[in-house]
Amino acid sequence: MSRYPVYVEITDDLCLGHCLDLPGCTVRASSRAETLARLPAAIREHLAWLRRHGEPVAPEADPIEVEVAGESHGFGPFNPGDSAALFPPDRAPVTLEEMEVYFRLMGHARADLLALVEGLPDEMLDRQQNAESWTIRRILRHVGNAEEWYVSRLAPPETLPAEWEHDDELPVFEFLAMERRTAVDRLRRLTAEEREAAVYPARWTNHPDEPWTARKALRRAVEHEREHTGQIREILLCDKT
């Protein structure tokens, strides 16, 4: 049996569960109980995902259990612009070697995303299911812009990549590639102090009281892309029915 600590963010009608030992492994549901019930299967799927991408993973154990190690109430990253919790493990300094592991996970998530959307005609990229829904193209722009934003939580504005100033002029797939390349390059140049500090950036946010660390930003980068890859997968499935 394997037991994993999990962390949850809870509002009145939504809950997001995270397995921080497996960055990118999350479950979003309408209640705490449903989230916790679904997390063991999500962990098993995430381990299978890591194996598919060639990551070293221990042999599968049965059963998988979860233990709530921390909870945050009243807010969570359920919609663009929402604040996200800083859990105790997020406060640990990130080593350069650990950063490369996160970058590898980001690469796996990007490979999954591109496998879904590369080759789609413009008609499908721009199809809107209803008045409130986002097109796939808009989701892709959001994914790239989010990487800018995560980096901007950690690095001084004057040190951010100049390529970001006119990124909206790039075709969407060139945009995604540029954002990833420049974001990773800038993150690799974080100082030791920046990789261990907890900061409260007030720029480009409605939540200046939200704490950030390098580990939280890297975790959210992996989680965020995997969440939106799932969203696009659902859109494409709906288009087939």
Residue ranges and their predicted role:
Residues 1-3, 44-99:
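Short, charged, surface-exposed hinge/linker loops at domain edges
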Residues 5-18, 22-29, 36-55, 114, ...:
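Short, contiguous alpha-helical
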Residues 14-15, 81, 85, 92, ...:
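Generic signal for short, ordered secondary-structure residues
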Residues 63-65, 122, 197:
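Generic secondary-structure boundary/loop-capping signal
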Residues 63-67, 141, 167-168, 177:
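Short alpha-helix boundary/capping motifs
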